[in-house]
Amino acid sequence: MYSTDIMRAEHDHIFTFLKAVRALCCQVLEGLPLPVDDFRKIVSFARNYSDHQHHGKEENFLFNEMVTNLGPIADKLINHGMLVEHDLCRRHVMDLEAALNLYEKDPQTIYKLDILTAAEGYATTLHRHISKE
């Protein structure tokens, strides 16, 4: 098995996770209470699996190999595309965590909106990102 096969399998796991994120957002929109603990688990999975484990492999190994073997085209694609999208996903996760912290202190609708917006932004951005890979 090639390392890229493992990374493709990780993409499948992440796609399943993203479907669950969107489903949870829909449940809240449909009137169910906002499950703070479940959204905290989203933050944890996003950081530990999607970012640390998966994006870490890309950033530490795959991207270097791509630049070595494909040259300037890969360098531009990685530095002006893939890494930018990784950082955007990280930003969505930070925003989600910040909104959760505010909501727990003061459960206002505006913070609930911020939670759903950050979670959906993360899910949409990462889904598009993986589809390009």
Kindly label every feature range from the protein language model.
Residues 1-132:
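Small-residue-biased structural context
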